[in-house]
Every structure is written in structure tokens, then in C-alpha cells.
């Protein structure tokens, strides 16, 4: 009898083991392919200094849908327009939330902002208000006089350099332009003559970007990573950055209380008015911390990204004289006898728009769209994507995908001439602002800033490389971070155009 029981038990164990192996094999077949990793850290070591480039290289081996283990966090990366469409459009509702990220949590006052807040009724109501009030076409047009004034200042500065035949640091000038416009639009303050004009403000923005884009162990090891962040001093530096930002916000609020302002309502005016009206957002009323979190999105989302795009565009143009000549001819032939190009003029400059789209294709300001968190199971190319998985869309890789773009490494704006591809999130080959429910709400504001600034610099000046250099010396190396700009500053010599 004992023998029968033993044999029966052994037989049952064999059946269970076979079933387990079959289930495991089936599960593995349903998961996306994965590069091999190490225990504990998984694939973290494969990200490198520029993760979008490293992930692009891995996708050439493992395909456009990859599963990685970043520490203890399962992460899926998609790298083609077709898989991006499945994520951002077809299955958007399954994966439009945000993960918990240490830096984002603190900078957004526990996810009270638009960019990093999880998907819920609060986020939907906040986004609706911001789209209607802060980032509407009406609001963008209302700050056009600010842009025109700041561009005139930039033209004066570049004209002085042209008279001396000295180089202009365009990386610095474009950043200064966007900072000046945003500071006036948000705070009604002149960056050059106000309390903002000091290294402290620049450091505030730089540090905030740094903490959002730098490695934080808490993000990859939720149960114990905070210890590493504490030991390395990251947590202390992050807390100081948030405290400094808090002081800055309060300073802006105090200035608005003191002033009896007239004219265009700025962003702080609007947000403080919504706070005073006790505007309801999902589960509660809009508070001062909500206002601070939204201002953080405005500062970080608008300043660096627009400046980076203008810098990349000028770098590509100086390296491609044919394109430079063609876009300048279009602008100058269209804008005869005008001192400054206006926003209305931009609609008559189709080739300029192609140049900007081509710049976004090769140099998207945020090459890995902000991570999404999967809320419910869905499939990409037959692979099952599980809840709580992090999901990245590599728009940098998509812009270089030979299946979507002929001669993908070439800067060739004419590729947009015979198609209707735009950057508004419906064409998944070109996604500088993302797509779906999480598309950048400030897309129109950012686009007009780039178009306006770039058009005027190309209209007013011809551009040359400094003495002792040739165009091939202009490098295209990238700087690491959440938003990826040109690693080395772009210095060019302006030559005043006298034909207008």
C-alpha cells in the first residue's frame, strides 16, 4: 500500500512539475523579449549615460518591444511608430497613469501637477483647466507682444556682435530668450532687471531638471532604494532644491500681492484667482501647493525644451548650407521690408516648418517620453503587458527608424513636403510632444516660441563658423538628462543681413 501511495504521489508531482514548466514556458512566450541582466540590478547597467541611445541599440537585437528589469521594476520600451501607436492610441486608457518617482513626487508637492500626477479625476480636471486657461491659443497670442519685445532685444545683441565680428553663444542666447519670455508671461517680471536675474534662478531650474533626470535608487528599488539615496546625499540635495523653489514661489506670490497691476493677466495672477475662487479639482479645492506644482511644470516644461530645439536647428543648418540658404530665401522673399517677423507671418513659411519638424525628428527635446504606468493588462504585438509595468516610448529611436524614414540619419526637411505628417500627436513617426491623454498641454506655446525665435534669427542674419573652424567642427554630441540638449555650446558668428 505504501508503495502505491508513493508512486501515486510521485506521479502527481511529475504532472504538477510538467504543468508548471508548461505554464512558465507559455508565460515567457507571452512576454516581450529581454536582454540578459544581472541579479538584483537587472538591466540597469545597460542604460548608459544616454539611455535613449542605449535602448535604441538594444532594440536592434531584441525588437521594437523589449522587456527589461530596471532594478526590481519591470519596464517595457517601445521603439517603432507602430508599437507607439498601440501604446499611445489603441491602448492609451490601459497605460496613461504615471509611476511613483522620488524626484517628481517632491517637486510636484506629492503629484499635484499635470506632468507627473497619476491618471484620475483630479488630473483630468486640472488638465482641462490648464488647457483652457494657461495654454490656450488665446493665451499664447496674448503674450505675443512679450515675445516680440524679447526677440528685438536678441536682435540688438546679435547686431552688436556682428559689428565686432565676434561669435554669439546661441545656446546661451536662446535659453535667455525663452527664460525672459516665460518670466514675463508667468510673473510679469523682466528677467534682466528683476530679482530673477542672478545665478540663483538659473541654479534653481538646473537643479530641478537634474533631480528629475538623474539616477535615483528609490525609483528602481522601491522597498529600500531610499537608503542609497540618503547615503549618497541625493535625498538631502533634493530636499534643499524643493525648499529653494518653495522660497522662490513665495517670493513671486508676495510680489503679486504688493502690486496693483494693469494689463495682461500673467500665469500667477490666473492661478491665484482660481485659488481664491476655491476651484474644485477632483477630490478637493485648489490650494497654494497646487499653484506651485503647476508653476513647476511651466518653468521646466517651457524653458529648456524650446531653447534646445532652436539650438539643434541652428547646428543642423550650419552643417547643411543648402538647407540654410533655402530656408533663409523663403523667409526673406516672403518678408520684404519688415523689421521683425510676427506670429501671423509664420503660416506663410512652410519650409521653415519643415526644418523645425526635421529638427524634432532627429533631436526630440525629451527623447524618452515621461514613463507611463500600466493600469490594466493589454497586448503589444501579441505580448502581454502586465499592470504596474513601467512603459517608455523611445521617440528618439522612432525618428531614426529606417522603416519609417528613408535616409533616416540625413537632415532633409524636404521629406515632409509630400505628406501631412505633423507633430500634433496623430502621426506616430514624429512625437516630440507625445500623444494620447498625456500629450504635452503646452505644445502650441512651445511650437510658436521655436518658430518665432528661429525665423527672426534666420531673417536678420547670415551665420558663419568662428575663425579657425569649418562646419565639420560643429559637433552633435548630446548632453545627458531628462531633456537632451547639445552637449557643447553652439558658437556662431552673425553677419547682419542688409537686404530688408
Swiss-Prot record:
Q: Which cofactors are named for this entry?
A: heme
Q: Which GO terms describe its cellular component?
A: membrane
**What GO molecular function terms would the record report?**
heme binding; iron ion binding; monooxygenase activity; oxidoreductase activity, acting on paired donors, with incorporation or reduction of molecular oxygen
Q: Which domain of life is it from?
A: Eukaryota
Residue stretches spanning the membrane: 1-21
Q: How does it sit in the membrane?
A: Single-pass membrane protein
What UniProt keywords apply to this chain's record, in alphabetical order? Heme, Iron, Membrane, Metal-binding, Monooxygenase, Oxidoreductase, Transmembrane, Transmembrane helix
Where does the record place it? Answer: Membrane
InterPro entries found in the cross-reference section: Cyt_P450, Cyt_P450_CS, Cyt_P450_E_grp-I, Cyt_P450_sf
- The entry's heme-binding residues are 440
The EC number on file is 1.14.-.-
Q: Does the keyword Oxidoreductase apply?
A: yes
Q: Which family does it belong to?
A: Belongs to the cytochrome P450 family.
Record-given protein name: Cytochrome P450 71B9
Source organism of this protein record? Arabidopsis thaliana (Mouse-ear cress)
Amino acid at each position: 500500500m505504501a508503495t502505491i501511495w508513493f508512486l501515486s504521489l510521485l506521479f502527481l508531482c511529475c504532472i504538477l512539475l510538467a504543468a508548471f514548466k508548461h505554464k512558465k514556458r507559455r508565460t515567457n512566450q507571452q512576454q516581450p523579449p529581454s536582454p540578459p541582466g544581472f541579479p538584483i540590478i537587472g538591466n540597469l547597467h545597460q542604460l548608459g549615460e544616454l539611455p535613449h541611445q542605449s535602448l535604441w541599440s538594444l532594440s536592434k537585437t531584441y525588437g521594437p518591444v523589449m522587456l527589461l528589469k530596471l532594478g526590481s521594476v519591470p519596464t517595457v520600451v517601445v521603439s517603432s511608430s507602430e508599437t507607439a501607436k498601440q501604446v499611445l492610441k489603441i491602448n492609451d486608457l490601459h497605460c496613461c497613469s504615471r509611476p511613483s518617482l522620488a524626484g517628481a513626487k517632491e517637486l510636484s508637492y506629492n503629484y499635484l501637477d499635470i506632468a507627473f500626477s497619476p491618471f484620475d479625476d483630479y488630473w483630468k480636471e486640472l488638465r482641462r483647466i490648464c488647457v483652457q486657461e494657461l495654454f490656450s491659443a488665446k493665451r499664447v497670442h496674448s503674450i505675443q507682444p512679450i515675445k516680440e519685445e524679447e526677440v528685438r532685444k536678441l536682435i540688438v545683441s546679435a547686431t552688436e556682435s556682428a559689428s565686432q565680428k565676434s561669435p554669439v553663444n546661441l545656446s546661451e542666447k536662446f535659453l535667455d530668450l525663452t527664460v525672459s519670455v516665460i518670466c514675463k508671461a508667468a510673473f510679469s517680471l523682466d528677467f534682466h532687471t528683476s530679482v530673477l536675474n542672478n545665478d540663483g534662478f538659473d541654479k534653481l531650474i538646473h537643479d530641478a531638471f537634474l533631480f528629475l533626470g538623474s539616477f535615483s535608487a528609490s525609483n528602481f528599488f522601491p522597498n529600500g532604494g531610499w537608503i542609497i539615496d540618503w547615503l549618497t546625499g541625493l535625498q538631502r540635495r533634493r530636499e534643499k532644491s524643493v525648499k529653494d523653489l518653495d522660497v522662490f514661489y513665495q517670493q513671486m506670490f508676495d510680489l503679486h500681492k504688493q502690486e496693483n497691476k494693469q494689463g495682461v493677466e500673467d500665469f500667477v495672477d490666473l492661478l491665484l484667482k482660481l485659488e481664491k475662487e476655491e476651484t474644485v479639482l477632483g477630490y478637493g479645492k485648489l490650494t497654494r501647493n497646487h499653484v506651485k506644482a503647476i508653476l513647476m511644470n511651466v518653468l521646466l516644461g517651457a524653458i529648456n525644451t524650446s531653447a534646445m530645439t532652436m539650438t539643434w536647428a541652428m547646428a543642423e543648418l550650419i552643417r547643411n548650407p543648402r538647407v540654410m540658404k533655402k530656408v533663409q530665401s523663403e523667409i526673406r522673399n516672403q518678408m520684404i521690408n519688415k523689421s521683425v517677423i510676427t506670429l501671423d507671418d509664420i503660416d506663410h513659411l512652410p519650409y521653415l516648418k519643415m526644418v523645425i519638424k526635421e529638427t524634432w525628428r532627429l533631436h526630440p527635446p525629451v527623447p524618452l517620453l515621461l514613463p507611463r504606468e500600466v493600469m490594466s493588462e493589454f497586448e503589444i504585438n501579441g505580448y502581454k503587458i502586465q499592470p504596474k509595468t513601467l512603459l517608455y516610448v523611445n521617440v528618439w529611436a522612432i525618428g531614426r527608424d529606417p522603416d519609417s524614414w528613408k535616409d533616416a540619419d540625413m537632415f532633409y526637411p524636404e521629406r515632409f513636403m509630400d505628406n501631412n505628417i505633423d507633430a500634433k500627436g496623430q502621426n506616430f513617426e514624429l512625437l516630440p510632444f507625445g500623444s494620447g491623454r498625456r500629450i504635452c498641454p503646452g505644445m502650441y506655446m512651445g511650437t510658436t516660441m521655436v518658430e518665432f525665435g528661429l525665423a527672426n534669427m534666420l531673417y536678420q542674419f547670415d551665420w558663419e563658423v568662428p575663425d579657425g573652424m569649418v562646419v565639420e567642427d560643429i559637433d552633435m554630441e548630446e548632453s545627458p538628462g531628462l531633456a537632451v540638449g547639445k552637449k557643447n555650446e553652439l558658437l556662431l558668428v552673425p553677419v547682419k543681413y542688409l537686404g530688408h
